[in-house]
Amino acid sequence: MGGRIALFVTFFGTLIAIIWGGFVGIFCGLVGGRVDDIVMRIIDAFLAIPWILAMLLIVVILGTSTQVLIPALGFFYGKGIVRVARAATHDVIARDFIMAAKARGHSNFSIIWNELFPNVRDAIMVEGAMRWSWMLLAFSSLSFLGFGVSPPTPDWGLMISEGRGLMSFAYWSVIAPIVALSSLIIGINLSADALAKALGIDRTQKAPV
């Protein structure tokens, strides 16, 4: 039961991150120039803000409902996907089929949807899977600190927080949710690594600045 709300929030948060991060990254990689520079400097500025401070500010002002947590997590974890999508776009932007699409007068949206997205989709999905695991840890951390879901909603982070006072005689009340959360995060990470290897994606490659 403890993982249901965490999976719900982080799954849809990851979808939001993939959608907006992927589109912005591909668009910046395609148009380049001043637009690319401005957007990436904005992304860099947001990346410099500690996510925990920003999330705490958001939940204090707007509350801890899923309608707040899902888009907030999706925004903060989409910034990294922007860089990955942009780097993947740079790898294919000079290929002949992109040049041909530009020569035929296709719009940027048409090139993104029909030419670029099918070629960078795999990299975005692998990065999204990794962000999902990090988002699970972030969501559980918020619940542990009392800024996530509220009782009686079952959540692993909340269970760990409430079980701390029972460690002396009921240690399993803390160990069980820790093991469950750790197993899920490790499983998602291993699945993402396996997917990257199957698709031939090098996750160690640096994104261009």
What are these regions (language model features)?
Residues 1-8, 36-47, 63, 117, ...:
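Alpha-helical membrane-interface segments at transmembrane helix boundaries
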Residues 53-57, 65-70, 74-83, 124-158:
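Non-cytoplasmic
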Residues 16-20, 29-91:
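Generic hydrophobic transmembrane alpha-helix motif, especially the helices
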Residues 58-61, 88-89, 138-180, 204:
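Glycine-rich helix-loop "coupling/hinge" segments at transmembrane-helix boundaries
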Residues 34, 87-97, 191, 195-202:
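Transmembrane helix boundary and interhelical loop/hinge segments in multi-pass membrane proteins
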Residues 1-30:
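Transmembrane alpha-helix signature in integral membrane proteins
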Residues 59-62, 66, 75-76, 122, ...:
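C-terminal transmembrane helix and the adjacent membrane-cytosol boundary/short C-terminal tail
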